[in-house]
């Protein structure tokens, strides 16, 4: 079974030990993405966010795995997360992660439509939710995100901005545009 891995952030420019075949391809499903998740090291990371995200094309790469559970495990290890934060679709068994990952139900629908004409029987992607409010006490907005970034110590702020700067050019979100306009990227 051919399995695709979807990416839109550091997975592309810093895949680390993620097993994959070939290079990242443009033409993945269009998903609403925004830098609305605060990571452990204070970066704002790009996540699927149906409330604040901008529809952007994602990328994909072939997994060397033939079993969807192995591809899920690979991505889970790379992302240093739990299994429920890895979404999947398996056309061979007609199963997906929508039931176990309610906030990604709509993403499953979008990815299923994209998968239709593709030469893959499965796909996996990171399904971390936005946590901006729980981490900062503020609802996510471009202004709140900039305020958050400006409140970081210098080295943490530079690391956070580097993450946004290194994202693929097509990940053109409102926050990224504003940071570019302010010449912070």
Go through each PLM region and give its residues.
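A glycine-rich, hydrophobic/aromatic-adjacent loop/helix-cap motif
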Residues: 1-185
